[in-house]
From Swiss-Prot:
Residues 1-19 form the signal peptide. The gene is SCW4. One of its GO terms (biological process) is carbohydrate metabolic process. It comes from Saccharomyces cerevisiae (strain ATCC 204508 / S288c). InterPro entries: Beta-glucan_modifiers, Glyco_hydro_17, Glycoside_hydrolase_SF. Its EC number is 3.2.1.-. This is Probable family 17 glucosidase SCW4. Glucanases possibly play a role in cell expansion during growth, in cell-cell fusion during mating, and in spore release during sporulation. It comes from the Eukaryota. SUPFAM superfamilies: (Trans)glycosidases. N-glycosylated. Glycans are attached at N89. The active site is at E323 (nucleophile). It is found in: Secreted, Cell wall. GO terms for molecular function: glucan endo-1,3-beta-D-glucosidase activity; glucosidase activity; mRNA binding.
Length: 386
C-alpha cells in the first residue's frame, strides 16, 4: 500500500523514528485498477490455444477517474510467468516457468479482537497461510502510530516464523535491527528504503543491522521507494536515478543482490520505462480494488496482472508480487466483499495460483492508519482477529 508524502518535510523526517508514515493507504490506487480492463488482446497460455484477456488502453492515465470495467475471461491458472532470479539469493528469488501451486488456508479465524495493538494472535494455524507463498509484509507500528518496541516486534515475529521472507518498507523505528534480532534463523528479509532523499542514511542503517545481527545472505532484495510513480511522487526517470543511487550505495556497503523500486502493476503497464531500472519487476496488486473480482477469483486475477506486467516489459523482466491480499472489514465495492471468510478464500486462491511469486499483504491489522475510502485500510491483517 502506498506510503504517501514520500519526500517529506524536514520536520516529518525528523519524526520518522517516532511515528508511522502518514497516509499509508491505497488512496490513488483505487482510481486506476479498473482501467486495466478496457479492450481485448490475445496471449498464449502455455503454448495452447490463445485466450482473450482484457488489456490496458494504450493512453490510459495512472490517476484517471475510475472506469467501468468488464469482466476478464482468461483462464489464467495456466498463464506462464517467470519468477525473479538472483545468483546472490537463489533460494528466495528463484527462476520458474510458472507460479507454483500449493496448499492454502482452510480454516477461519474466530478469536475476539482488540484495537490496543495492531497485532493479535488468532489461534489459526499460521503454517496454512505461509505454505507456498514467498513471504508476508510487516510494519512495526502501534495503533497510535508510535514505534513498536523491540520486544513487541519480537512477539509479532514469533507468529511469522513459517513465512520464508518478511518484507519491510523502511528503516525507521529501528525496524531492520529489531526484525533481524527476532526473525528465525532460516528466514530472509526483503528490505526497503522508504525516504528516497535519505538513501545513504537508509543504506547505513541496513548495513549496521546486517553486520551486527546477520549477513547480506539474509537479504533477498532491497527496494528504493514504494509506489513512487503511482503516487505522483516521481517520474520513471527519477525512479531510475534513485535505484542507481541505491544500488551504488548498497554495493559499497557489501550488498550485491537485487535492487528494485516497488510500484503498482498499473504504474508499470502505463510506464514501461520502469522496466529498465529494477533488477526484476516488484509490483503491488489487489483484486479487491478491481471491484469486478470476487475474493475466490483473486488468484486468477493476479496471474492476469503478472502477465500484463511481463508483457509490458517485453518478457525481459521477471515479476514478483510484493503485496496482495483481501480486506476483512469495510464496505462492499462492486462484487468485492470484505470479510474474514473472503480474506481466507482470497489467500487460498492467491497461494494456489501464484503463491511462490507473492508476498501476502499483510501480517496484522494496521489500526494506525486512517479508515480511507471504503473503510478497508486498517483491515488487511491475515493473522488478526477481525
Amino acid at each position: 500500500m502506498r506510503l504517501s508524502n514520500l519526500i517529506a518535510s524536514a520536520s516529518l523526517l525528523s519524526a520518522a523514528t517516532l511515528a508511522a508514515p502518514a497516509n499509508h493507504e491505497h488512496k490513488d490506487k483505487r482510481a486506476v485498477v479498473t482501467t486495466t480492463v478496457q479492450k481485448q488482446t490475445t496471449i498464449i497460455v502455455n503454448g495452447a490455444a490463445s485466450t482473450p484477456v482484457a488489456a490496458l488502453e494504450e493512453n490510459a492515465v495512472v490517476n484517471s477517474a475510475p472506469a467501468a470495467a468488464t469482466s476478464t475471461t482468461s483462464s489464467a491458472a495456466s498463464v506462464a510467468t517467470a519468477a525473479a532470479s538472483s545468483s546472490e539469493n537463489n533460494s528466495q528469488v528463484s527462476a520458474a516457468a510458472s507460479p507454483a501451486s500449493s496448499s492454502a488456508a482452510t480454516s477461519t479465524q474466530s478469536s475476539s479482537s482488540s484495537q490496543a495493538s495492531s497485532s493479535s494472535s488468532s489461534g489459526e494455524d499460521v503454517s496454512s497461510f505461509a505454505s507456498g507463498v514467498r513471504g508476508i509484509t510487516y510494519t512495526p507500528y502501534e495503533s497510535s502510530g508510535a514505534c513498536k518496541s523491540a520486544s513487541e516486534v519480537a512477539s509479532d515475529l514469533a507468529q511469522l516464523t513459517d513465512f520464508p521472507v518478511i518484507r519491510l518498507y523502511g528503516t525507521d523505528c529501528n525496524q531492520v535491527e529489531n526484525v533481524f534480532k527476532a526473525k528465525a534463523s532460516n528466514q530472509k528479509v526483503f528490505l526497503g528504503i522508504y525516504y528516497v532523499d535519505q538513501i545513504q542514511d537508509g543504506v547505513n542503517t541496513i548495513k549496521s543491522a546486517v553486520e551486527s545481527y546477520g549477513s547480506w545472505d539474509d537479504v533477498t532484495t532491497v527496494s528504493i521507494g514504494n509506489e513512487l510513480v503511482n503516487g505522483n511522487q516521481a517520474t520513471p526517470s527519477q525512479v531510475g536515478q534513485y535505484i542507481d543511487s541505491g544500488r551504488s550505495a548498497l554495493k559499497a556497503a557489501g550488498y550485491t543482490g537485487p535492487v528494485v523500486s516497488v510500484d503498482t502493476f498499473i504504474a508499470v503497464i502505463n510506464n514501461p520505462e520502469l522496466c529498465d531500472y529494477s533488477d526484476y519487476m516488484a509490483v503491488n496488486a489487489h483484486a479487491y480494488f478491481d471491484k469486478n473480482t470476487v475474493a475466490q477469483d483473486s488468484g486468477k486475477w493476479l496471474l492476469e496482472q503478472i502477465q500484463r506486467v511481463w508483457t509490458a516489459c517485453d518478457g525481459k523482466k521477471n515479476v514478483v508480487i510484493t503485496e496482495s491480499g483481501w480486506p476483512s472489514k469495510g464496505e462492499t465495492y462492486g462484487v468485492a466483499v470484505p470479510s474474514k471468510e473472503n480474506q481466507k478464500d482470497a489467500v487460498s486462491a492467491i497461494t494456489s495460483s501464484c503463491g511462490a511469486d507473492t508476498f501476502l499483504f499483510t501480517a496484522f491489522n494496521d489500526y494506525w492508519k486512517a479508515d480511507g475510502a471504503y473503510g478497508v485500510e486498517k483491515y488487511w491483517g491475515i493473522l488478526s482477529n477481525e
